């Protein structure tokens, strides 16, 4: 490990690896560090991604694709089921990944592009001089180091310290954190070509239960509930109840517990010499909590802007503002619209959800026009259409794609 690089990336998740790969391909000297000894472990999500956007970053590989999903089922509290094709199911439906292999494949691509990758290497602080980030202090195998750089990219996840060290407000209110629990189960006995989403305030207050196929009759089965709506029952207890009632033959072989920020965007994600990407920048989707593709998209933008700034010889916040502007115009717009949807739906009663599902149950979501969708929503819930009016204006203008591309 050298004492100076052009770019240091903190965190080797999807966002960090794409940032490192992009910067290295631009000819920059890049160091990417990961605090854990194994990249991709532990798993923090349901592992679903949309096909179109994934292919913008990496060619799909059977080694890390567990399931090729053709659609999703949304199940209302009374059991009414809506089927949606993959193209209409959102940014987390398409492929179900094996994250442990996928994350390492991305890190390997960054290394092949020229980045230096160091595991079991923990950032302990930033080096800040004249109000500018100029490197990091780190711990590697029990030894302390100071490594300087022209730009630091913080991709250190939900618990990010990098942004906080730089004076960026990244704290999230408990009410804006989705508390999650997930099992990997065998003997799942579900259709391995579909993802399942169960809605209802009894099974998941202000949230949902998901089932993502993993191949070989296995599935990720998880729950996410909004912190502000969590009652006496903990997510793990609600999940246990769901599995007992709906998957009595399932066998638990792995468990993950964590939290996902669903707060929408934070005020800023840059400082002099610094950019934040992924969960560190609160770029996850407020509805689903999914953030793999958003992190990768943001990482690519950050890597490109890092190269531009370094070539220009100016890594100030004014130059890095281009990163802020670019991700907010794309990723940020989708996040803001998802936040409107989330804030609308968390106030729905089970009766509201049942009514909506009943009105949409026979719709073919692969061929429906926007106008017919609006008519169906209006029939189901007139207030809903009014609450979401701003989003539909953007869709009609073609400014939002919601990651529904095939």
Swiss-Prot record:
Indicate the enzyme's highest-level EC class: oxidoreductase
Q: How is the cofactor bound?
A: Binds 1 FAD per subunit.
Q: Which cofactor does it need?
A: FAD
Ion transport found in the keyword field: no
Would you tell me the protein name for this molecule?
Digeranylgeranylglycerophospholipid reductase 2
Similarity comment: Belongs to the geranylgeranyl reductase family. DGGGPL reductase subfamily.
Its GO CC terms are: membrane
**Catalytic reaction(s) noted:** a 2,3-bis-O-phytanyl-sn-glycerol 1-phospholipid + 8 oxidized 2[4Fe-4S]-[ferredoxin] = a 2,3-bis-O-(geranylgeranyl)-sn-glycerol 1-phospholipid + 8 reduced 2[4Fe-4S]-[ferredoxin] + 16 H(+); 2,3-bis-O-(phytanyl)-sn-glycerol 1-phosphate + 8 oxidized 2[4Fe-4S]-[ferredoxin] = 2,3-bis-O-(geranylgeranyl)-sn-glycerol 1-phosphate + 8 reduced 2[4Fe-4S]-[ferredoxin] + 16 H(+); a 2,3-bis-O-phytanyl-sn-glycerol 1-phospholipid + 8 A = a 2,3-bis-O-(geranylgeranyl)-sn-glycerol 1-phospholipid + 8 AH2; CDP-2,3-bis-O-(geranylgeranyl)-sn-glycerol + 8 AH2 = CDP-2,3-bis-O-(phytanyl)-sn-glycerol + 8 A
């Amino acid at each position: 490990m050298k004492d100076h690089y052009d770019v240091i990336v903190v965190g080797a998740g999807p966002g960090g690896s794409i940032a490192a790969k992009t910067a290295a391909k631009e000819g920059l000297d890049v160091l990417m560090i990961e605090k854990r000894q194994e990249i991709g472990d532990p798993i923090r999500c349901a592992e679903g991604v949309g096909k179109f956007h994934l292919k913008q970053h990496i060619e799909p590989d059977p080694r890390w694709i567990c399931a090729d999903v053709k659609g999703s089922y949304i199940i209302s509290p009374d059991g009414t089921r809506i089927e949606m094709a993959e193209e209409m199911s959102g940014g987390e439906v398409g492929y179900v990944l094996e994250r442990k292999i996928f994350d390492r494949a991305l890190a390997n691509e960054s290394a092949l592009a020229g980045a230096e990758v160091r595991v079991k290497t923990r950032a302990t602080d930033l080096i800040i001089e004249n109000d500018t980030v100029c490197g990091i202090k780190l711990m590697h195998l029990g030894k302390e180091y100071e490594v300087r750089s022209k730009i630091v990219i913080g991709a250190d996840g939900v618990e990010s310290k990098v942004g906080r060290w730089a004076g960026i407000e990244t704290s999230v209110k408990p009410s804006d954190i989705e508390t999650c629990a997930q099992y990997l189960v065998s003997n799942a006995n579900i259709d391995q070509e579909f993802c399942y989403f169960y809605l209802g305030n009894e099974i998941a207050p202000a949230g949902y239960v998901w089932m993502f196929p993993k191949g070989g009759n296995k599935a990720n089965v998880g729950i996410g509930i909004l912190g502000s709506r969590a009652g006496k029952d903990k997510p793990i207890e609600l999940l246990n109840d769901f599995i007992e009632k709906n998957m009595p033959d399932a066998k638990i072989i792995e468990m993950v517990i964590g939290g996902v920020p669903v707060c929408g965007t934070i005020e800023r994600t840059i400082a002099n010499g610094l950019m934040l990407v992924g969960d560190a920048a609160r770029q996850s989707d407020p509805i689903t909590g999914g953030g793999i593709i958003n992190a990768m998209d943001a990482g690519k933008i950050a890597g490109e802007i890092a190269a531009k700034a370094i070539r220009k010889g100016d890594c100030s916040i004014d130059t890095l503002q281009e990163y802020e502007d670019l991700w907010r115009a794309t990723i940020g717009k989708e996040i803001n619209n998802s936040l409107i949807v989330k804030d609308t739906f968390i106030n729905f009663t089970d009766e509201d959800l049942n009514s909506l599902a009943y009105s949409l149950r026979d719709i073919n979501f692969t061929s429906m026009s926007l106008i017919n969708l609006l008519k169906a929503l209006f029939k189901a819930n007139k207030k809903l259409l009014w609450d979401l009016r701003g989003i539909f204006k953007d869709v009609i203008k073609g400014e939002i794609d919601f990651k529904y591309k095939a």
